[in-house]
Each structure stands twice: as structure tokens, then as C-alpha cells.
């Protein structure tokens, strides 16, 4: 079974993805890390984030083992990832890697921004996780403070809105729900309630798959 989870920053999709992957025993790929690692490689080699050729080269050279996940979770790296993700050739360079991961025997779970629309358009289950701007900013601020970063809520909210605009308006694979995705609004849900809601969606898709019918 292939599960695609998409959504904007701090919507809760990453937490849901990890919980669901563990529950169903599926390998999990946070595809956002690919773009963060690409941006990190650019900066480490002294390139500007707007250097298209360097960004494309970094993406093509990336391997799934190139992740120092803790070092990629900062607010700065999130912003940098959004910049390089807007380069169509970078996205194209990373598509095959993501599809190979999704094609593993037994299935996989991928989360990102274009899994259900571009990477795995035929996924067995698609969930688009969203929440209000304010709820997402609150979550992101708490997350960053938990890592010891000094955070201003207003600045985090502004960053999220800018990133939403960039992600949804880019020419290549803009952020949007797949036509057959189930939208899950987590604004008023805690982690456990969101997980239970997502579990119902996935189990419904799984039951439909076993019955030989389209998931939705």
C-alpha cells in the first residue's frame, strides 16, 4: 500500500506520517528533507540559493544517506528548502529518487507537498493535512523553542505565510490537494485526535483496496 500525505508547513503532516508508518509497518520518507539537504549542500559549498546550476547539480548528486536530520530541521533550513524547491529542475532531479522509494515491495508512506499530485498520483491513499495559519505558527514556534532556538511568533507566522505563497504559486508542482485526496483539518485537533482521524481514512482506503474498488 502506498500512502501519500501532503500539506503546508507545520500542519502536522510529519507527525502523522511517522505515526502512521509505524502503525502499518511501512518505510517512511519525509521528502522535505531532500530539499533541505539540497539547500544545505549548496550553502556548505559556498553557493547562493539562487544559483540554479549549482542547485540542480546538488539535487542530482543527493543520496538518501545524505541526511543529518537534526541539522536540517532549523527554521533557516526550512526557508532555504522552499527556495530551492521552487526550481523546476531541482524537483525533476528528485522525482525518480522519491518514486523508487515509493515502489518498494510492500508499499511505503511518503509525506511532502506534491506526493499525491506528482510523485505518486496513483497512491492507494491520499491525505492533505492542513490547519489555520495561526495554529501552524504556534506549533512551529513551540517546536523551534523546544530545540533551543529564540523565536518570535509574529516572525514565524510571517515566514509560514510567505512559504505558503511560494509553495502554492510555483510553476512546478504547486502545493495543492490532489483531486482524490481526503482533506484533514487539524486546527482544533491534538496529536492523538489527528492520528485517529488519519487512521480512519487510511483504514477505509485499505478496506476499499482489499475489496478491489477505488479507494475513494
From Swiss-Prot:
It is found in: Cytoplasm. Keywords: ATP-binding, Cytoplasm, Kinase, Nucleotide-binding, Transferase. It comes from the Bacteria. One of its GO terms (biological process) is pyrimidine nucleotide metabolic process. GO terms for molecular function: ATP binding; CMP kinase activity; dCMP kinase activity. Gene3D superfamilies: P-loop containing nucleotide triphosphate hydrolases. One of its GO terms (cellular component) is cytoplasm. Its EC number is 2.7.4.25. Its main location: cytoplasm. ATP binds at residues 7-15. SUPFAM superfamilies: P-loop containing nucleoside triphosphate hydrolases. InterPro entries: Cytidylate_kin, Cytidylate_kinase_dom, P-loop_NTPase. It is an enzyme of class 2 (transferase). Coiled coil: none annotated. It catalyses: CMP + ATP = CDP + ADP; dCMP + ATP = dCDP + ADP. Belongs to the cytidylate kinase family. Type 1 subfamily. HAMAP family: Cytidyl_kinase_type1. This is Cytidylate kinase.
Amino acid at each position: 500500500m502506498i500512502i501519500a500525505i501532503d500539506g503546508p508547513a507545520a500542519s502536522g503532516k510529519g507527525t502523522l506520517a511517522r505515526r502512521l508508518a509505524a502503525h502499518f509497518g511501512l518505510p517512511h520518507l519525509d521528502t522535505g528533507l531532500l530539499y533541505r539537504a539540497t539547500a544545505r549542500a549548496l550553502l556548505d559549498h559556498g553557493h547562493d540559493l539562487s544559483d540554479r546550476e549549482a542547485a540542480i547539480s546538488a539535487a542530482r548528486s543527493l543520496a538518501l544517506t545524505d541526511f543529518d536530520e537534526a541539522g536540517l530541521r532549523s527554521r533557516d533550513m526550512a526557508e532555504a528548502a522552499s527556495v530551492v524547491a521552487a526550481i523546476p529542475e531541482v524537483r525533476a532531479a528528485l522525482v525518480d529518487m522519491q518514486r523508487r522509494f515509493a515502489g518498494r515491495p510492500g508499499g511505503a508512506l511518503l509525506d511532502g507537498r506534491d506526493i499525491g499530485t506528482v510523485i505518486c498520483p496513483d497512491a492507494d491513499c491520499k491525505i492533505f493535512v492542513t490547519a489555520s495559519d495561526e495554529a501552524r505558527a504556534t506549533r512551529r514556534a513551540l517546536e523551534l523553542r523546544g530545540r533551543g532556538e529564540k523565536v518570535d511568533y509574529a516572525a514565524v507566522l510571517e515566514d509560514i505565510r510567505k512559504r505558503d505563497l511560494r509553495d502554492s504559486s510555483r510553476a512546478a508542482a504547486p502545493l495543492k490537494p490532489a483531486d482524490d485526496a481526503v482533506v484533514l483539518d487539524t486546527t482544533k485537533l491534538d496529536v492523538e485526535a489527528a492520528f485517529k482521524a488519519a487512521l480512519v481514512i487510511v483504514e477505509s482506503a485499505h478496506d476499499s483496496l482489499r475489496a478491489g474498488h477505488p479507494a475513494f
